[in-house]
Amino acid sequence: MNSITDVGGIRVGHYQRLDPDASLGAGWACGVTVVLPPPGTVGAVDCRGGAPGTRETDLLDPANSVRFVDALLLAGGSAYGLAAADGVMRWLEEHRRGVAMDSGVVPIVPGAVIFDLPVGGWNCRPTADFGYSACAAAGVDVAVGTVGVGVGARAGALKGGVGTASATLQSGVTVGVLAVVNAAGNVVDPATGLPWMADLVGEFALRAPPAEQIAALAQLSSPLGAFNTPFNTTIGVIACDAALSPAACRRIAIAAHDGLARTIRPAHTPLDGDTVFALATGAVAVPPEAGVPAALSPETQLVTAVGAAAADCLARAVLAGVLNAQPVAGIPTYRDMFPGAFGS
């Protein structure tokens, strides 16, 4: 499927409101995406952007007490969008997911947001009902492009969106990634008109677009003003089925950021809140390789392999999110600007 849900037990749900006539400053154009892992999934996070909007990320520090993650929320609406986590918690409580207490459960729902408030009406932003509805819609089929948290996303001057990708390692471990691309930087090489690292997404059969289409990109500025919007953010979720510690997940999240640097230029700017979560379901136990020095963690070799695959998959997911995007509020898509890049 080439999806994050290729990792057994992972489910993804979207919910959005999108008015057909949404514009910059009016109408609904926002949404949320929820990743539901199986019980017992451990997690970690690494934030490299200068303007993050997050929830419960301190809890994911490997030094802290709670190990398991019940859901991850990716939301539009900037900090207001964090309200959608209340709906995720309500859904999880109804399904008895969370840290067991004497009188009930406390769901663990870390999350991160993108800044998309100028796309659509400023007051049209996710509520708790968005989070609840995304959980209720979760399944193994993952829609991409202009959906969920990606509805109001943009990538430089172009429309951004949600993408996903996966890979299977020789060890049998499956790595899957979900990304929402809402970057301040550009995803297209202005010299060629092709996305950076376009060779990673052979399924699109991209070819060099004609010179006039490349020239048109140079004349295009973001409808919101290039680098004049307050904040942006690309969020990634890495999932794998390996049995790993929270500290190992943190190292994988760190490595996965390379996927953003390969496909977004610049990435990790003061205008972005670039954040990557990493989840490990624990379904596949991989014995440590022989010969690992006793001074090193027995997870070292596996973490290296999973981290490398995570970076590759995150790069592919970024490209998939942009290439599958549909126009919203007059923000052009890659397909709008470069029809000549696609085979007939």
Swiss-Prot record:
Residues passing through the membrane, by range: 25-45, 68-88, 104-124, 133-153, 161-181, 224-244, 276-296, 302-322
Q: Which UniProt keywords apply?
A: Aminopeptidase, Cell membrane, Hydrolase, Membrane, Protease, Transmembrane, Transmembrane helix
One BP annotation, GO? proteolysis
User: In terms of domain of life, where is this protein from?
Assistant: Bacteria
The molecular function terms of the Gene Ontology recorded here are: aminopeptidase activity
Membrane topology type, per the record? Multi-pass membrane protein
- GO cellular-component term (any): plasma membrane
Annotated EC: 3.4.11.-
Give the first-level EC class, as a single word.
hydrolase
* Task of the protein: Aminopeptidase.
**Family affiliation:** Belongs to the peptidase S58 family.
> What name does UniProt use for this protein?
Uncharacterized aminopeptidase MT1375
Q: Which organism is it from?
A: Mycobacterium tuberculosis (strain CDC 1551 / Oshkosh)
Q: What is the lineage of its organism?
A: Bacteria, Bacillati, Actinomycetota, Actinomycetes, Mycobacteriales
